[in-house]
Amino acid sequence: MMAALEIQQLRGELLHDEPLAAHTSWRVGGPARRFYRPANREDLVAFLRALDPDEPLLWLGLGSNLLVRDGGFPGTVIATRGRLDFLARRGRRGLYAEAGCACAKLARFAARTRLVGAEFLAGIPGTLGGALAMNAGAFGGETWPLVRAVETVDRYGSVRRRLPDAFTIGYREVHGPAGEWFLAAELELEPGDTTAARARIKSLLERRAAAQPIGLPSCGSTFRNPPGDHAARLIEAAGLKGERLGDAQVSEKHANFIINTGAARAAEIEALIERVQGEVERRFGVRLVTEVHRVGVKQL
């Protein structure tokens, strides 16, 4: 617990029993016991130092790639969206960005400042922090090949600068020092033409809109692609395109997307995920691994 004096000294916004459905791209999820929007990096550090070290923590950006169960999260959510989003050009090829910066914003900023190589980030519906945590990718690009260094913070508020060799990077997974979260990154890009970079972003977003159910509540891609294949192909081949459970549905437009068609519950989405996994494994002997992270308790 935090002392009243410590709370008064914080500059961010502290909410209690905040419904997480309002903060996730699937529009589902029960309440967080505490929900904190830090004013800035210094405020975040002060908050972490004042927090009980045993308090469960969940870091939340745009709320994509995340399924919060209906019972909510029995701890503290730290929401970086619109808060830790500082961006700056550094030198001839460098770009510095805080973890709460939306990937699409980062891609546009890089293009505007004549840096190329980050255009694919425009197709990732999350923040840089989330992209770093899972090595997010789109249209053939991945996050970590751009990384020169990262800054992390632990639950005690200690900030560190780490190089990529401190992490094990894989396909849609990243393993690093335990108990640390991404605070910012230094990216290395190439000098280039703003007009060409903007045109590439426009083209990628048009491809995304043509192939994916943009505008409908989803988490983005639900499953990782298995080696040598595509999750969407396997799901469609199993006859699961359009499969429904309550208001949760496998998208008719892209089978690797599960959408909330109205008032789906997290339990329905989770059950549909497991149904898809079971049927694909039964038909093809392939166990699909989820990209989405499931957190919280199942029932209130």
Where are these regions (language model features)?
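Anion-binding (especially nucleotide phosphate/pyrophosphate-binding) glycine-rich loop
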Residues: 1-128, 138
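Phosphate/pyrophosphate- and phosphate-bearing ligand-binding catalytic cores of soluble enzymes
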Residues: 15-16, 22, 28, 66, ...
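Beta-strand secondary-structure signal
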Residues: 35, 96, 149-151, 184-186
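Residues embedded in well-ordered beta-strands within globular domains across many folds
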Residues: 88, 119, 151, 292-293
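Acidic/polar active-site rim loop that often engages polyanionic ligands
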Residues: 88-92, 131-132, 180-184
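Glycine/threonine-rich beta-strand-loop-alpha-helix active-site module
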Residues: 115-120, 125-164
